[in-house]
Amino acid sequence: MEGPAFSKPLKDKINPWGPLIVLGILIRAGVSVQRDSPHQVFNVTWRVTNLMTGQTANATSLLGTMTDAFPKLYFDLCDLIGNDWDETRLGCRTPGEGKRARTFDLYVCPGHTVPTGCGGPREGYCGKWGCETTGQAYWKPSSSWDLISLKRGNTPKDRGPCYDSSVSSGVQGATPGGRCNPLVLKFTDAGKKASWDAPKVWGLRLYRSTGTDPVTRFSLTRQVLNIGPRVPIGPNPVISDQLPPSRPAQIMLPRPPQPPPPGTASIVPETAPPSQQPGTRDRLLNLVNKAYQALNLTSPDKTQECWLCLVSRPPYYEGVAVLGTNSNHTTLISTIMGLLIILLLLLILLLWTLHS
């Protein structure tokens, strides 16, 4: 009986580049899982830029993960409106003009998502009322979907003109650079979940009861840098030599003293206590105790609800855990999917090896 068509051995039908392809996919999957780790620390820089002048109003850098590096950003209104803003001499060229700018309400409109009728850059994306999502005004503009909130900082209302402390150091209330219109930018919950791969733009306007409200625009940019490879840690040089646990010192019974020769005074010899080197267990307990003392002195509120954990094998890493709620549902699913993909690819590689 003739065999069926295409009855060549299985190994003749397999792509000879199969192992390399599978290996490349495995490496790529491993890199993807490592890159998507929510615990990886980066050097994150947030930058607020005045788009009218190109000047940087704020640049804040910090170390953190992609899910928690969202600090408050502090800058000044004069960093956004500059010296000469419009034809009504509203700006920050003189100390008096800076003080005057403090008397106006301000409102902010997003340029990253522009609703219908809100205009473009010329209107500061505030082409009609209702486009504003945040600010400091009597009608309290707010939004449930915008990425930031921008409010005025704490400035005493009775503070006088905005004098520069480097020029007028003797004037009460003078500040560095004459800045007396502090602003505070905070990230909303939506902003902490948004993608910041590209700059995002907002328009800012000061509210005036008559005339046109002047416009300025600013951008917010995030720059993420890898802090480099991790440096291996350990072993702890203090407890590198392993010793058994300390044992109670053996009590040596003294021998009966020899009677002194006739005519000499009796001298009782002093015996030094036997020296005992602490064992590994003693030093580990001392390490935990010292860590607790340091934690208790620096953050006494944390010692009431935290655990001190010590790995029982070298290099004896020590960790601090605080009780709280946490949810890693999304992270757990992505991790499981990544492991399943790797196991599937390993199975394919194993089958190829068996048939070759």
From Swiss-Prot:
It is a single-pass type I membrane protein. Residues 353-356 are intravirion. It comes from the Viruses. Residues 33-331 are virion surface. Residues 1-32 form the signal peptide. A motif (CXXC) lies at residues 306-309. GO terms for biological process: fusion of virus membrane with host plasma membrane; symbiont entry into host cell; virion attachment to host cell. Its main location: host cell. The chain crosses the membrane at residues 332-352. Residues 254-263 have a biased composition (Pro residues). Residues 247-279 are annotated as: Disordered. Glycans are attached at N43, N58, N296, N328. Keywords: Fusion of virus membrane with host cell membrane, Fusion of virus membrane with host membrane, Glycoprotein, Host cell membrane, Host endoplasmic reticulum, Host membrane, Host-virus interaction, Membrane, Oncogene, Signal, Transmembrane, Transmembrane helix, Viral attachment to host cell, Viral envelope protein, Viral penetration into host cytoplasm, Virion, Virus entry into host cell. One of its GO terms (cellular component) is membrane. It is found in: Host endoplasmic reticulum membrane; Host cell membrane; Virion membrane. Compared to other gammaretroviruses which possess 2 envelope proteins (gp70 and p15E), FSFFV gp55 corresponds to a gp70-p15E fusion protein with a deletion of a portion of p15E. It is encoded by the defective env gene of the virus. Strain BB6 gp42 is a truncated form of gp55. The Friend murine leukemia virus complex induces a rapid and fatal erythroleukemia in adult mice. It is the replication-defective spleen focus-forming virus (SFFV) contained in this complex that causes foci of proliferating erythroid cells in spleens of infected mice. The second component is a replication competent Friend murine leukemia virus (F-MuLV) that serves as a helper virus for SFFV. This envelope-like membrane glycoprotein is responsible for ligand-independent activation of the erythropoietin receptor EPOR leading to the abnormally rapid proliferation of erythroid precursor cells. In the first stage of Friend disease, constitutive activation of the EPOR by gp42 causes uncontrolled, polyclonal proliferation of infected erythroblasts, leading to polycythemia (massive increase in the number of mature red cells). Homooligomer. Forms heterooligomers with mouse EPOR, probably via their respective transmembrane domains. BB6 deletion mutant does not interact with mouse MST1R isoform sf-Stk. This is Glycoprotein 42. It comes from Friend spleen focus-forming virus (strain BB6) (FSFFV).
